[in-house]
Design a protein with these regions (language model features):
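Active-site nucleophile elbow and catalytic-triad environment of alpha/beta-hydrolase enzymes
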Residues: 14-30
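Hydrolase active-site cap/lid region
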Residues: 1-14, 69-71, 78-81
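Conserved alpha/beta-hydrolase "acid-adjacent" motif
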Residues: 46-53, 79
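Acidic beta-to-alpha connecting loop that harbors the catalytic carboxylate
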Residues: 44-46, 72-73, 139
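Short, aromatic- and glycine-rich surface loops/edge beta-strands on solvent-exposed regions
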Residues: 172-186
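Short beta-strand/loop motif that positions the catalytic acidic residue
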Residues: 34, 40-42
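Surface beta-strand/loop "capping" patches
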Residues: 81-82, 90-136, 149-170
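Catalytic histidine neighborhood in serine/cysteine hydrolases
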Residues: 58-78
Length: 190
């Protein structure tokens, strides 16, 4: 898929070489066979990996396999210090003697009314939250060059979900968004 962005207008030309790569080498090919817990980390602006395809890979993992993920916003080929801490906590939870809770990953929903976007962040309340941010980009198909903006926090709704808002510029066809929740135990999830 290198150079072919997930949300491009054009169709992917599937030649024999591309079919072989997807069937045998690409992460999509073996994700369904993974049986161990997974910590999936990626940068949002990598020139080597299409950030938009990360959830495609995770969607191929069996529902019985536990996984969590975290994104490094605006990083290219490196991960941020929060991902490093996630690795430490994940390894300690899997191979150490620490009982570390990994809640389910947060979910973000968006409702549109004209140029106004209302975003709702639903997260696990099994751990205390330190902070949360919602990142958004308008219309940039190539994830490597997206300039991520943060949405304005407007408060919690009656069910405890966090509410954010963003005003789009009006000429955008596509909006890309994700959330990052940092917990007081040092864990960060997207």
């Amino acid at each position: 898929y290198k150079g072919i962005y997930k949300f491009s207008d054009g169709d992917i030309v599937m030649d024999e070489e591309r079919r072989k790569f997807i069937a045998a080498v690409d992460a999509h090919a073996y994700a369904q066979y993974v049986k161990c817990p997974i910590l999936f980390l990626t940068s949002t602006n990598s020139t080597e990996y299409d950030f938009d395809r990360s959830l495609d890979t995770l969607s191929r993992i069996s529902p019985s396999v536990p996984y969590v993920f975290n994104f490094s916003p605006a990083f290219n080929v490196y991960l941020d210090e929060y991902c490093r801490k996630d690795v430490e906590l994940f390894l300690a939870s899997q191979f150490g003697k620490k009982n570390i809770t990994f809640p389910i990953c947060p979910e973000l929903s968006i409702e549109q009314d004209g140029n106004f976007l209302a975003l709702t962040l639903d997260y696990s309340d099994t751990l205390k939250i330190e902070s949360a941010k919602v990142y958004i980009n308008e219309g940039v198909i190539n994830p490597a060059i997206r300039n991520w903006n943060t949405c304005d926090f407007v408060g919690d709704d009656e069910s405890g979900k966090m509410k954010y808002e963003y005003v789009a510029n009006g000429s955008t066809r596509n909006v890309y968004a994700f959330a990052i929740v940092r917990y007081k135990n040092g864990l960060t999830l997207s």
